[in-house]
Amino acid sequence: MRQHVNPLSRFFQLPLELPAPHELFEHPNLPIHLDIGCARGFFLLELAAMQPERNHLGVEIRRPLVQAAQHDRDRQEQHNLHFLFCNANISLEAWMAALPPDQLQLVSIQFPDPWFKQRHRKRRVLQPALLLAIAAALHPGRHLFLQSDVLAVIEPMVALVELSNCFARPKDDPQPWRSSNPLPVATERERYVQEQGQPTYRVLFERTQAELPALRDLEMAWQQVDNSKDAAPTPHG
């Protein structure tokens, strides 16, 4: 069972200076795939072995999972892969901003902790500031991939991305949800959901040439959308 941590607790609010690519990877100039909330890391351990042409970075807020994943990475000598402990909403923005232009080519957020209640909005992994930092680091045509098995988790993420106007779904991509994963490896959670015969909700976004909105404007728009959903009347049978 997944153990949640509160990202708003004081311990997780301390910013960390994350290592630069040359400290993480054997070939630091390769394109980077960033997986936010990588959990135990099995997905990236498998994917990095299949994609040596990319560097893969997994970040996770639960330190014991990062330590176990990094141990496996070291044992397997996967030099295009690294795992880091951090709160993505506190420490990732500066790291992404320091990357060379167009080095970050894919960001994935898969099956994040289900903080779906409106009062827990600030605990969700994809916050407006983090989204804008991702959008700033991704060049047009690069991708943001989201998936979850909980509609109440992925719908606010999709709403936030669409409100930013910085991303669009690729032409002819299925809507509202992709039936297939664009990545060649499934996460542990994805495999479990498939075994149970339950749906997975996936969206692939492509960075457009649109300029970033003001952070305050995006925060207010997102809050209005969330509040309107909470205020919607419940049907009575």
UniProtKB/Swiss-Prot annotation:
It comes from the Bacteria. The gene is trmB. Belongs to the class I-like SAM-binding methyltransferase superfamily. TrmB family. One of its GO terms (molecular function) is tRNA (guanine(46)-N7)-methyltransferase activity. It is an enzyme of class 2 (transferase). Disulfide bonds: none annotated. HAMAP family: tRNA_methyltr_TrmB. This is tRNA (guanine-N(7)-)-methyltransferase. The keyword Transferase applies. Keywords: Methyltransferase, S-adenosyl-L-methionine, Transferase, tRNA processing. S-adenosyl-L-methionine binds at residues 35, 60, 87, 113. Gene3D superfamilies: Vaccinia Virus protein VP39 (3.40.50.150). Substrate binds at residues 117, 149. The keyword S-adenosyl-L-methionine applies. The active site is at 113. Pfam families: Methyltransf_4 (PF02390). Its EC number is 2.1.1.33. InterPro entries: SAM-dependent_MTases_sf, tRNA_(Gua-N-7)_MeTrfase_Trmb, tRNA_methyltr_TrmB_bact. Pathway: tRNA modification; N(7)-methylguanine-tRNA biosynthesis. It catalyses: guanosine(46) in tRNA + S-adenosyl-L-methionine = N(7)-methylguanosine(46) in tRNA + S-adenosyl-L-homocysteine. GO terms for cellular component: tRNA methyltransferase complex.
